[in-house]
Amino acid sequence: MNPLSAVFNSVVLVLLALGVTDVFFSYESSRCSMTYMFEYPQYLQIKLSKKVSRLYPLYELYLYGEGSYAEENKNLTLTGVPVLFLPGNAGSYKQARSFASVALRKAENIGNRYHFNIFTVNFNEELVALYGGSLRRQTRFVHECIKTILSLYKNQTFPPESVAIIGHSMGGLVARALFTLKHFKPDLINVIITQATPHILPVLSTDIYLTDFYTMVNNYWIYNSLKLRNITMLSVAGGYSDYQVRSGLTFLPTSSFHTSALSVVSSAVPITWASTDHLSIVWCRELVLVTARALFDLIDEHTKQINIDPQSRMSVIKHHFVRHPAKHLESRHQITASFTETPKFTLVEDSKWTYTVNKESNESFFLFPLLDKRIAYSHFHCQNTFLYTHSWIFGCNKTVSPKCLQINDLSWETELLPSAKVVNLKLDVYSNLSHFILYIPATNGSKFSVECEFLSEEARTVHVPVTHVLSFGFSSSHAPLNSSGLLYVIQFEDFSKIYQAFNVFIVRNCGQNKESKSSIYKFHVPWSHEDLIGVLSDELPVRISAKLHAEQPQNDNRLVKLFLYASPECLHEVTISTSFSQILGQIVRFHGIYLPVYIVANLLLAYGAQLHSILIQGSCMDLDLSFDVAAKPYKVDPVLIICKYLLNYKWFKNYWDGLMLPQLDAVQLHAYGFWFPLASLFFFIFGTSIAYWSSIGLQAAVRILSSLWIYLKRPSMFPKESKCITYRVYAETLFFAFISWRSCGTFSLLLVFLRYLSKVLILYSSMKNYVSLNAHIVKDTSSKQDSVKTDSDTNINSNQLTHHQPSSLEIKALDDCLKMHFTILHLNLWIVLLGLPSFIYWLKTLRYTIQLDPDPNRVSALVLIFILEILMNSTTSAIKSSVCLKTAAVLQLPLSIIVVAFGTLHLYRISNLIAFSLFLHVVCCFV
């Protein structure tokens, strides 16, 4: 082991561990509360047709109910609005309980004017995120469920013609996949709400069925956007707390024709303002309440079904999930208002104004003239805390209505924040108005405050350049806010990349003033709905983890902003500095799943170096030394960078397509905004370190197991070279092939791996035993001790070597074989690891069927079984004189390049490329 390599790879591994720690542990504690219920949940199974039950014996459809509602609906005389819940990966149909219970309580609160019937599908908790072979089957079953659900409403006055769908995780993707079915009518679905659904790409592209399913669904929605424009889509992500599905994957693929789609992060959802993990997004009370309110507002009061107007539906969704004006949606049409008699106005001519009520107040109207303010100021900003009225700010044009009897309700421009309602009105937009009117209702025993000011946006905007990524947090940018304003806007310059991450500290100092109101911050990303909103504390500075879920679009010049709704009695200071650990976390969050690609690429380079050393030196190099020699990023990355660059030219693209080569994965990642120039370099180095230390760890495991093997069964014969193909090889190949064909391909590969491991253990134990035995005999001979004990030991040892006394050359040849077998074993291990998702799925369904169908690894497993069985009996001496050895050694570099080029988004291709690499070795054994 080279000490420098060990130290370097250790440091790299520590950096990777820091990134992993940031992803899995460095997020805010959950601010979600549990939903609660008053009655025990009941799930009434809906009887499906015999044909459907026969085709999908593992799937079921249920209707949710509680108490008297469940009893009333036992005969399935339904009168509500149908909503279908689709669970996701390993999800239970009982996850519908939280939303269904809240919806039932809300229906009771409004006197059951209308209500929802919540249906839920039992997918048998299938692991569809790991195995894509059952996604089409689930999609077809959901289609049958929708037809069955709608048939239950035939006797209604206004029977529903469509179903609203709530899909969690992969259930949301299944909902979108319904439209790809040949005989599916798009009118059967009007609203789809997905929760933590990876829409753009699979989290793990473990098999071809999964990637093909994604390609089919996304292409259909892009190419048929006009046809699907009446479908209202909402995708809700969990934020940084959801480390299983990062939020960037949940953003819906956009199209200029499909405008009825919206993607938000739960931390930006009004009233929720909390990040959720992958499971809590289903039961988070704050988010469930918002979802329930939105669905109730989607109902048309005349038909008591979901509104058929897609624009109205989208306005409802945006009202609840983007910007909540603290007003009921049902009064949206009331833009204008009027007074029957002239109210008593109080004229306010100051640029700053505060009104505080501690106990009681009379109804008041405050009039703010605009004419003399338009020159010096650009905006009128107001904040109120605990003022419980929906309409509180109006506009008046005294030219049209001299006594301001006709007014415009401007409260729709209000934004609801955690402890306040704020409004920021641009004076140029309201050039037709002469006055703003502030309405204070009569109160008794209420305590609230209202603060308003005219401000200049330019004077209140602070431009702060972010610190460089490589500053490692040693430098920072400061923005002291020493004036007594209500609103400040801090614009972060050059903050647009996904690999950027910063700590933003906000210090608030109110001195001795203990009665100051709260200050609120909003970290706003203008090109996606991923805002972070919170309240400042007087005791400790607030730290905001400023990073992006989505990269800035190419033609978007807007800047990331921090809005600070301040208390005028307090001083504030904003400091921003680079967070190195969060940068590593962003790299791992966006690209960590691609690590197996770079690990295998490094192993193939090291494997090629070993074959080359056999060709040149006649002996096999140690695997850890071969990493030092061959695992260099400049051998792989430049080729990919050049290809990616040339693909921008039409002539090269035509040549590429003429060779029928698949799309370069880096090009696709760049198109999604998930790639940056040094990503491949970083992960190649990470892959080298993992491959290096995993090889050392595997060697240590082999040593420990071999010691146990020697203790249990001491080898008595020195292993001799044998033919690559024997009757035993035929028998084992047929046995493992039968298992692969009748059960699961990865299961057979796991058995082959264990068989190969036993082969390596036997070889290592034999070499270790004979090396130690020879050393012991030499020591006894040189010392010339004639004690009885020594003589007896020597006789015993000599008897063990009676049949064959190995020479140093034979032991050296065995050592070379072990080095080569160990590398092949390591590659075999990664073949098994990459196939584990389908193996886990097969284990879960083993009680229903013994055969995995379809099996993504069956054919490749059959090929690999034959290859590995031959390689088990191969030796380095057998390939030294091979005419194909040089070709096999040279081709490992192109193979490693191909692994990175085409395996990043298609992990299942890696096993096939490893199989081809090992096949070249097999050829060397015979040619």
From Swiss-Prot:
It is found in: Endoplasmic reticulum membrane. The keyword DNA damage does not apply. Keywords: Endoplasmic reticulum, Glycoprotein, Hydrolase, Membrane, Protein transport, Transmembrane, Transmembrane helix, Transport. One of its GO terms (cellular component) is endoplasmic reticulum membrane. The chain crosses the membrane at residues 5-25, 596-616, 673-693, 734-754, 822-842, 859-879, 888-908. Residues 26-595, 694-733, 843-858, 909-927 are lumenal. GO terms for biological process: endoplasmic reticulum to Golgi vesicle-mediated transport; GPI anchor biosynthetic process; positive regulation of ER to Golgi vesicle-mediated transport; protein transport. It is a multi-pass membrane protein. One of its GO terms (molecular function) is deacylase activity. InterPro entries: AB_hydrolase_fold, PGAP1-ab_dom-like, PGAP1/BST1, PGAP1_TMD. It holds the Pfam family PGAP1_3rd. The active site is at S169. Glycans are attached at N75, N155, N230, N362, N397, N432, N444, N482. Residues 1-4, 617-672, 755-821, 880-887 are cytoplasmic. Its EC number is 3.1.-.-. It is an enzyme of class 3 (hydrolase). The keyword Transcription regulation does not apply. Belongs to the GPI inositol-deacylase family. PANTHER family: GPI INOSITOL-DEACYLASE (PTHR15495:SF7), NEGATIVE REGULATOR OF VESICLE FORMATION-RELATED (PTHR15495). GPI inositol-deacylase that catalyzes the remove of the acyl chain linked to the 2-OH position of inositol ring from the GPI-anchored protein (GPI-AP) in the endoplasmic reticulum. Initiates the post-attachment remodeling phase of GPI-AP biogenesis and participates in endoplasmic reticulum (ER)-to-Golgi transport of GPI-anchored protein. This is GPI inositol-deacylase.
